[in-house]
């Protein structure tokens, strides 16, 4: 019997700026409603979600706005629009939590990463987040630098 291969997610796009610019609250995993050429283009790993966000519309549906999935090069005239809004697939309870966080607490829905799960499905990790002020960003940088320095000191000591 063959050994199971490790279940490593293939990350298609990551929003590394989000953890710097926002205080990340609760995270959610959502499915993405994509066309065939979008899936193929995502597998190449050239998508960008740094400037994107998600929003809940009046019908209670969540859409990913401003994410760029470039056109698939090998596709013909039936290619997709690179910046079109894409529907996110979530449970009703999760959508209610997201809309409540946005309306009452003044938070935003930020995408953290797009990846393919072990079944090959495209998933997106989104989070309710609150924007950081400049002094909060500086404080985060100081903590990170101190942790690096502390690690160096401990490593050099031993």
Curated annotation (Swiss-Prot):
Entry keyword RNA-binding: yes
Function: Required for rescue of stalled ribosomes mediated by trans-translation. Binds to transfer-messenger RNA (tmRNA), required for stable association of tmRNA with ribosomes. tmRNA and SmpB together mimic tRNA shape, replacing the anticodon stem-loop with SmpB. tmRNA is encoded by the ssrA gene; the 2 termini fold to resemble tRNA(Ala) and it encodes a 'tag peptide', a short internal open reading frame. During trans-translation Ala-aminoacylated tmRNA acts like a tRNA, entering the A-site of stalled ribosomes, displacing the stalled mRNA.
One GO BP: trans-translation
One family name in Pfam for this protein: SmpB
PROSITE patterns: SSRP
Underlying gene: smpB
Annotated CDD domains: SmpB
Subcellular locations according to the entry: Cytoplasm
Keywords recorded for this protein, A-Z: Cytoplasm, RNA-binding
One GO CC term on file: cytosol
Region (Disordered): 133-158
Keyword Iron-sulfur appears in the UniProt entry: no
Family listed: Belongs to the SmpB family.
UniProt protein name: SsrA-binding protein
Gene Ontology terms, MF aspect: RNA binding
């Amino acid at each position: 019997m063959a050994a199971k291969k490790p279940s490593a997610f293939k990350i298609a796009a990551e929003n590394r700026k989000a953890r710097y610019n926002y205080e990340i609250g609760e995270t959610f995993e959502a499915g993405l409603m994509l066309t065939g050429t979008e899936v193929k283009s995502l597998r190449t790993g050239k998508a960008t979600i740094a400037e994107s966000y998600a929003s809940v519309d009046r019908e209670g549906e969540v859409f990913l706005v401003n994410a760029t999935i470039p056109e698939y090069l090998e596709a013909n005239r039936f290619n997709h629009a690179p910046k079109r809004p894409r529907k996110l697939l979530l449970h009703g309870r999760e959508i209610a939590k997201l809309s409540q966080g946005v309306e009452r607490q003044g938070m935003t829905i930020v995408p953290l990463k797009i990846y393919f799960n072990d079944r090959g499905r495209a998933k997106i990790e989104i989070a309710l987040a609150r924007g950081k002020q400049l002094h909060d960003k500086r404080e985060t940088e100081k903590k990170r630098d101190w942790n690096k320095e502390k690690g160096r000191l401990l490593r050099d000591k031993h």
